[in-house]
């Protein structure tokens, strides 16, 4: 569609912040963030807690950020045109964005995935860019919560609540290694959800590890500073030694102070215990009990602190010994280098003297001078060999390993795991719920009258808030101002039990919004009455699986699994009704839920995609660079097989596999560009007890084409009862879409039907992989006889498990779990011959199993050229093979293209474009080879004129 904009308007749009002529990718949006300054929207993937500002938006698709300008959102909302975005590549396919939050005191944002975190500068949000890998940190566990604090113009303090504990990192922009772990507490119970926030420098934590716990973390900034100084000066031994001696002096002073403090605490404890024992009645205003409880906390904190200090002292003394030994080694190296410099100077003088003797013509002197020069060169070469010896390189590597071990001991990474409660200096709240009641989200509402912490599960909502105390005036939140807290809770009916995907605090009233995959529920909080009330489900139009929420006064934006953005406007008259007065799609989702399978059909004028999820089967059409839904059928599926699109008949047949049955569908493309998807019927199989058998996969006879009805359709279905059944569907009548099943054969029970592909033939045959075997079967229907057994034409026993299969014109490709791929050639008699095997398929990658094979083939006079593609978690690996006379004549690895889809399921070729692919999973991503990679592929393309 062509927009009617003048060049002046186009220039103004291009100059907008966050504007680019790119279309949004259809990947999961799990984090929505409004930028403070200019109204941009940033989008990421699912998160547990959102910092929402009042003026701008950022969204994240997969491992990237999408920046959408506020005017672009308004334009899309009014015109229905696709949202144009600025794409910032952060994690790519390595991770998915889970949280976007600002860094206080800066215009930058911190972005984290499941295991990675990155600092994204504000200038990178103005145009499409890629975040430097030096600003991406991989953490030792799954990230639960993140907190970032500015310490100086070049330094940040980052705190990560991981599944395995609490970690502090320093980020310094001026060092080559930006990130450095400076303090770590490892816990022995996995933390599944949580939240971090600061108040006046104090770090607060709320988490769930079977218990809901809230407390204040005791941070030792002097210890963090020591680790940082050791890391910075790790290669400057003299300065490092001074740092160590200074720290030992500080520890000795600390020991003297703590000894006296412990004696005072013991004296106080004895007095309090005697007082508590002697008192028969509690005297009003007596604080002995509270003082004794506080003293117990002080004893615990001191014990933990003294234990860490003693371990630090042992590590520092060990470091002194290591430094001294390496200083001696460095002195020896410096002496050798000084000696080498002296010898080089002497060699230079001898060479000058030799040149002067050469001018005299005295052969005797010339000979002696050259002998002296050669002897000196031998001495120099020997010294150079010593300086460059492997021993010195080994010495340098050992120093790096030892200093890393010392740093891990100082920051706590090498310590044994402990109870998380031991690192909390003050326990604020603790709650144990039902074992089935797992708390997945924590939300801190700092905008309400009283600071309130919400702990959310699929069944229960807890609200923790102070009983007394004035509203804190600073921007930070202090939940410790009052030591007494009220707790309100609501347990929903079991029918409401759900798995929450997103949650956020309300703006117009006290409470929270919670969302599962399909709906949004308000939970209102009446703090004065200590009462929580679950409101009615929001009435929203049909939408994708919800993955994120951005709430603003009287409006809401929902993000979905396949890239959708839904805007809702509420009635201003009431803060509690949340009646939706308007809704509009800012970005259309490609489907409802994750894509299980996709098939592309080229119609001549456009490109169609037939894809399925757990909830529906969808037909989408590509208009330039934008995919839009055309029609859909309810009912989920996990596998699709289609006939090639018939340009003459304007249609295609599809076999769609659901859990326990197979549906036949006809896709018709009318002359007036109307696309229809018609249900023709279904087939299923039952066991001896009449229970339906689970369907694993389907495949069509490749000779099948779309024809006018009545016609026949041959297909095979793999079932979970270790059998493959083949069918002929008799499609009768022009408009009466019914299926008559003609049972032909049941293949003998197999060990396991893992991969199945039909091939040409009368009878039709199937390639079947079963663990470490490849079987080839033919159906005996030569004379249209019924219920005859199938015949196994060939059985190949393999050395490794089969992970994928692909059939192309005359060849069968088999991928294995041990990084190999074998090519077989079809012989036309129901058998295949091995052409060759390619070892080390994933060159330079960590992947082993060869998955998701797709092949392009071209036949020339010199042989058959195969371009073989396979999918890994992060790459599309491309090889080329030339087959001549049933042998591999040439094999070359071309490229490993890094795609942007996290946790992909599969991929398909885009018709007529050898450099373009559609990767699918939680959404879809259109991938294109770079110009350099295309040129590399063109080097192997055999051009011939026929």
Curated annotation (Swiss-Prot):
**Which domain of life does this protein belong to?**
Eukaryota
Q: Which residues form a coiled coil?
A: 326-363
UniProt cross-references to InterPro entries, sorted A to Z: WD40/YVTN_repeat-like_dom_sf (IPR015943), WD40_repeat_dom_sf (IPR036322)
**What keyword terms does UniProt attach to this protein?**
Coiled coil
Q: What this chain does, per the record?
A: May have a role in tumor suppression.
Record's protein name:
Protein dct-6
| Native organism | Caenorhabditis briggsae
**Gene (UniProt):** dct-6
